[in-house]
Amino acid sequence: MAAGSTIDALGQFELHPVLGGLGESLRFSQSPVMMIVASVLVLAFLYVGMRPAAIVPGRLQAAAEICYDFIHDMAVDTIGPEGRAFFPFIFTLFFFILAGNYLGLLPFSFAFTSHIAVTLALALLVFVLAVIVSLKAQGPKFFAHFMPAGAPVALAPLLVPIEILSFLSRPVSLSIRLFANMVAGHVMLEMFAAFTIMLAGLGLFGDVLAVGPVVINVALMALELLVGALQAYVFAILTCIYLREAVAH
């Protein structure tokens, strides 16, 4: 966290091999470990929550049903009736990102959503799916979208490359949005936590001054809980929007 008077706020994002020599040879770091943990937690939540409904649902089952209905309604309302076919994908995507965001807030954990390689891979998955669905639903008419309707044909050499570039930038913007928000939040938490420890090492006067950063860190933690859920929602709703455009004829 801090060495002497230096605060290393970016050290938390460094990848280190786990499982000793085996992990080093396989390039198996804490990032895939936390992805596996996130996947297991989501599956466990669904398994426990989606068991045959009791007469009086427990809290976990009630929470699972609320989450199910929320994502289902979002998919159908945004995409249309075709959204039911994409519901499992959107549901999995939302909770995988949400679990990754929240796991990163635990002590000695790792936020895999704070790595651009992970968020870009998720964004490319969404992008490729949207392109495949577009080609299947629209056929050759899909390429007509790169020429704005009503625009003069003479402007095609200028407008078509711009539209293609805008379309290809979707996975980049989608991945950077999640990555940047997670990095910014964790850097702020690390800085104020390190600042608190540095002040606490100054004796009684430092302990009094450290109250301020502690309060700020608690507020930041609450904010990160909100941001973690919000970013998972934004990623999911943008996925729905891209798929809505893909299925539109």
From Swiss-Prot:
It is found in: Cell inner membrane. SUPFAM superfamilies: F1F0 ATP synthase subunit A. Pfam families: ATP-synt_A. GO terms for molecular function: proton-transporting ATP synthase activity, rotational mechanism. It is a multi-pass membrane protein. GO terms for cellular component: plasma membrane; proton-transporting ATP synthase complex. The chain crosses the membrane at residues 30-50, 86-106, 115-135, 142-162, 191-211, 218-238. Coiled coil: none annotated. Keywords: ATP synthesis, Cell inner membrane, Cell membrane, CF(0), Hydrogen ion transport, Ion transport, Membrane, Transmembrane, Transmembrane helix, Transport. The keyword Metal-binding does not apply. Its main location: membrane. HAMAP family: ATP_synth_a_bact. Key component of the proton channel; it plays a direct role in the translocation of protons across the membrane. F-type ATPases have 2 components, CF(1) - the catalytic core - and CF(0) - the membrane proton channel. CF(1) has five subunits: alpha(3), beta(3), gamma(1), delta(1), epsilon(1). CF(0) has three main subunits: a(1), b(2) and c(9-12). The alpha and beta chains form an alternating ring which encloses part of the gamma chain. CF(1) is attached to CF(0) by a central stalk formed by the gamma and epsilon chains, while a peripheral stalk is formed by the delta and b chains. NCBIfam families: ATP_synt_6_or_A, PRK05815.2-4. Belongs to the ATPase A chain family. This is ATP synthase subunit a.
